[in-house]
UniProtKB/Swiss-Prot annotation:
This protein's name: CXADR-like membrane protein
PANTHER family linked: CXADR-LIKE MEMBRANE PROTEIN
GO BP term, example: postsynaptic modulation of chemical synaptic transmission
Membrane topology: Single-pass type I membrane protein
Disulfide bond annotation, renumbered to this chain: 34-110, 152-207
Region (Disordered): 263-372
Transmembrane regions: 235-255
Keyword field contains Signal: yes
């Protein structure tokens, strides 16, 4: 009974074969093992077949040997990349794939048949993809006292991808660890929060993204700025603008003042005083033969003008006496007002006597006013 049970277990194992799991990186070469002892007695009846069941459950034939022929171009995806690794007739029916692609991942089955005997072996192939080069970014303003987030992410690669941040030592004595007040987001390991930035936080930071296939990294520089320096720059710019405006205003005022003074100087000679008093009399050249009589007429006219009203005096003073032509002497005398449109009349002896009497009786102040 025990011998029968041992034979049954041996037959079951030999029939179903073993399960093997292999991990390889994409673009590399892999060999899937499959060994048998069924080809030595009778080689003409030997059949070898490799099958692939992908992650979606679809099954396809990869390579076969039958009737002394090898068929290895059965699928378009693996055409020219699959072959038997060794002498399959001697008992090594291992499959070789080069180069590997992510689509090669799945469950491979090696089936060997000869004269009614079967050997099965199963290999689970996992194709690992290296992380793509991550992209390092900064979120926030790198100013003193603020918080800054370092972001790192790979677009492709076999999960899980592990991210690791560190500082790059640029000078002797610099620490490679992150600043003390740094927090890692465990829900998103590619994010690191730098809290309460100081000038010591400035430097070069490196992010490394890695998995079982390999790793890639990126770097980003953090330069912490003083908040005061930003305020000083803003104040300096404001001061420059205000100074420029002030200078422009002063220049404009000076130009305006000069223009006003020039305008006043040009208009000053043309001013006319409206309150100036009109001339009372005009000197003319009388003839020598009638100088005595004109003096008498002048005195008589002055006497008559004294008794007239103020309006007639103004009209009389504005009149002008025309000079007499053909005079030989150069003597001058005061002439009185003339009535428009009429010749001055000669004073009578009686009239002159009355005028002299009137002048003698007038106060001295009045006489002085009349003789002006």
């Amino acid at each position: 009974m025990s011998l029968f049970f041992l034979w049954l277990v041996t037959y079951y194992v030999g029939t179903l074969g073993t399960h093997t799991e292999i991990k390889r990186v994409a673009e590399e070469k892999v060999t899937l093992p499959c060994h048998h002892q069924l080809g030595l007695p009778e080689k003409d009846t030997l059949d070898i077949e490799w099958l692939l069941t992908d992650n979606e459950g679809n099954q396809k034939v990869v390579i076969t040997y039958s009737s002394r022929h090898v068929y290895n171009n059965l699928t378009e995806e693996q055409k020219g990349r699959v072959a038997f690794a060794s002498n399959f007739l001697a008992g090594d029916a291992s499959l070789q794939i080069e180069p590997l692609k992510p689509s090669d991942e799945g469950r491979y089955t090696c089936k060997v048949k000869n004269s009614g005997r079967y050997v099965w072996s199963h290999v689970i192939l996992k194709v690992l993809v290296r992380p793509s080069k991550p992209k390092c970014e900064l979120e926030g303003e790198p100013t003193e006292g603020s918080d800054l987030t370092l972001q790192c992410e790979s677009a492709s690669g076999t999960k899980p991808i592990v991210y690791y941040w560190q500082r790059i030592r640029e000078k002797e004595g610099e620490d490679e660890h992150l600043p003390p007040k740094s927090r890692i987001d465990y829900n998103n390991p590619g994010r690191v929060l730098l809290q309460n930035l100081t000038m010591a936080s400035s430097g070069l930071y490196q992010c490394t993204a890695g998995n079982e296939a390999g790793k890639e990294s990126c770097v980003v520089r953090v330069t912490v700025q003083y908040v005061q320096s930003i305020g000083m720059v803003a104040g300096a710019v404001t001061g420059i603008v205000a100074g420029a405006l002030l200078i422009f205003l002063l220049i404009w005022l000076l130009i305006r003042r000069k223009s006003k003074e020039r305008y006043e100087e040009e208009d000053r000679p043309n001013e006319i005083r409206e309150d100036a008093e009109a001339p009372r009399a005009r000197l003319v050249k009388p003839s020598s033969s009638s100088s005595g009589s004109r003096s008498s007429r002048s005195g008589s006219s002055s006497t008559r003008s004294t008794g007239n009203s103020a309006s007639r005096s103004q009209r009389t003073l504005s009149s002008e006496a025309a000079p007499q032509p053909g005079l030989a002497t150069q003597a001058y005398s005061l002439i009185g007002p003339e009535v428009r449109g009429s010749e001055p009349k000669k004073a009578h002896h009686t009239t002159l006597t009355k005028a002299e009497t009137t002048l003698s009786t007038m106060p001295s102040q009045s006489r002085a006013f009349q003789t002006v």
